[in-house]
Amino acid sequence: MWRCPLGLLLLLPLAGHLALGAQQGRGRRELAPGLHLRGIRDAGGRYCQEQDLCCRGRADDCALPYLGAICYCDLFCNRTVSDCCPDFWDFCLGVPPPFPPIQGCMHGGRIYPVLGTYWDNCNRCTCQENRQWQCDQEPCLVDPDMIKAINQGNYGWQAGNHSAFWGMTLDEGIRYRLGTIRPSSSVMNMHEIYTVLNPGEVLPTAFEASEKWPNLIHEPLDQGNCAGSWAFSTAAVASDRVSIHSLGHMTPVLSPQNLLSCDTHQQQGCRGGRLDGAWWFLRRRGVVSDHCYPFSGRERDEAGPAPPCMMHSRAMGRGKRQATAHCPNSYVNNNDIYQVTPVYRLGSNDKEIMKELMENGPVQALMEVHEDFFLYKGGIYSHTPVSLGRPERYRRHGTHSVKITGWGEETLPDGRTLKYWTAANSWGPAWGERGHFRIVRGVNECDIESFVLGVWGRVGMEDMGHH
């Protein structure tokens, strides 16, 4: 390390000019505007001192990273246009800096006062009294490092930044974007309906419900930051099944809000709910269309009460129900109540699920969502190991429910065949493949084949004629 005695200060301008004259021509460093002239100053930073670095004359490698730029600890930096590190004068020359100290912290070319804040994705950074930033260290739902690792890892699917998730922590994603409570042991042990393939019956290698039943399979909705996948997936499957089983005479998009607000027995609305309770309500009480009772979009309201139920019905005989209230949406007059028959559980064999789906329509599936699923952009999803070496708080999962709409196969570059399900999520059309995703089939990936439900829409001849 070189330190300049105070007696040599008068020679410093001359040393700077000599160093400049020794160069052949003028390089980028000479032509660039000085850091401090651009207002890039961090008087509280310890740069030269941290590295014990002071250099004579001009030494372009006597440099350090500095607020997105480069600063120097050599005598040449102290020319008319200065690019010295902020502690150069104090540490190397033993004199006060020629620039007034900043009362605050620098970020993005802007000065923040002490206790001022800015957000770095999901983490809040606060300016401390020592003029240094202190940032939270929460795992973010959108993790650029994880996106990069997945896309470079050849896992068979692509990751990306879903803008609606930017700024959310991973914990918030698990709490607000899922919402299906894992069924009790008694429900998980409910009797399975086994579907038997006929002798010689061969299922197609690819199937999509929207191709067999055009205009009867509804597009995904967006649950927002409401932990209500239990209501959204139930309403989605019931909507398609009622449309299919009525032969297209009834094509409602059923209301998740009707379930969220009115199915309150052991249910928690936007704080989570159970699938068995949702299907009981649809069978015994029924719901109206989403146009009649639209989603209110309440988000992250953990402390407040659930929106009150604004739709009620009465028995008409033979199990049918009739609405006793007008639509919450005053622009809609049709308040018809839609119901289903008792829900049934399918076997976990993928062939049984495929046959049921092809004959009767989309099915509902429980699944475990891991931290990387939120980043899904396209391809055939399987949970990746990219977070295995990180602390446990970066490896989170929760229970979700979705609508399976079809299946297919894809030939990999090495010649292997990869089988997959196609499914509709409830995170809106901007997520994944237009609101849908593909996931590996036949190996119970993320438990998606462990608890699969089907149901029949309650449709009578009077319904067919009425509609």
UniProtKB/Swiss-Prot annotation:
Keyword annotations from UniProtKB, A to Z: Disulfide bond, Glycoprotein, Secreted, Signal
Summary of the tissues where the protein is detected: Highly expressed in aorta, heart, placenta, kidney and a colorectal adenocarcinoma cell line. Moderately expressed in skeletal muscle, pancreas, lung, lymph nodes, adrenal gland, bone marrow and thyroid. Weakly expressed in colon, small intestine, ovary, spleen, testis and prostate. Predominantly found in vascular smooth muscle cells, but also in cardiac and skeletal muscle cells as well as kidney.
Domain SMB: 50-98
The UniProt record lists the keyword tRNA-binding: no
Pfam families with a match to the protein in the record: Peptidase_C1
Location of this chain's protein in the cell: Secreted
An example Gene Ontology biological process: endosomal transport
Post-translational modification comment from the UniProt entry: Glycosylated.
Gene Ontology terms, MF aspect: extracellular matrix structural constituent; laminin binding
Position of the signal peptide: 1-21
SMART domains according to UniProt: Pept_C1 (SM00645)
Glycan attachment points: N78, N161
GO cellular component: collagen-containing extracellular matrix; extracellular exosome; extracellular region; extracellular space; lysosome
InterPro entries: Papain-like_cys_pep_sf, Pept_his_AS, Peptidase_C1A, Peptidase_C1A_C, Somatomedin_B_dom
SS bond list: C54-C73, C71-C73, C71-C85, C77-C84, C85-C92
Record-stated family: Belongs to the peptidase C1 family.
Cited function: May be implicated in the adrenocortical zonation and in mechanisms for repressing the CYP11B1 gene expression in adrenocortical cells. This is a non catalytic peptidase C1 family protein.
Protein known as: Tubulointerstitial nephritis antigen-like
Gene this chain is encoded by: TINAGL1
